[in-house]
Amino acid sequence: MCMIEDGHGRVLVQHRRPKASNSWHGLAFPGGHVENGESVTASVIREVEEETGLVVSNLHLCGIVEWEIVGEPPADSAAECRPDSKYIVFLFRTTSYSGEIRSSSEGSVEWMTLDEMRSGDMAPNMEEHIRVMLDGDVNEAYGLSGQTLRLL
């Protein structure tokens, strides 16, 4: 996941659409899954371009968000969630990008301030994602699926 900053106090926000395969929706930053044979950084660059039209560079790794599913996933979990599993999201920031923004099947995108994002319908636990990205003293958020994440 990547927070892209425009240098004018705004970040690129995606209005993630609810899908049958993934119930995680709302305002979030672009990002996705790592494909086989792909590094984490390469996956962020690819996912951001696929979802927003922007090509990012000079990525700064801020920390991680991890959560565990104990037993069966909650009914509203993403279809790819497996029983007794752990998921890790790598959180990046950048101010370096090229291209023009465009929406994708994942959702529409627009520039907004963090205050505007926070006052909107954010995806679950996005506040904890933002804290890890912005607070140099916090580098991880952890929790069990369906619960609020703890900052570490």
What feature does the model see in each segment?
Residues H33-S57, E68-H129:
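Unchanged
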Residues R131-L152:
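Charged phosphate-binding loop/patch that engages nucleotide di/tri-phosphates or the phosphate backbone
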Residues H60-G63:
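Conserved S-adenosyl-L-methionine
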Residues R10-V11, G26, V109:
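A residue-level structural signature of the nucleotidyltransferase/glycosyltransferase Rossmann-like core
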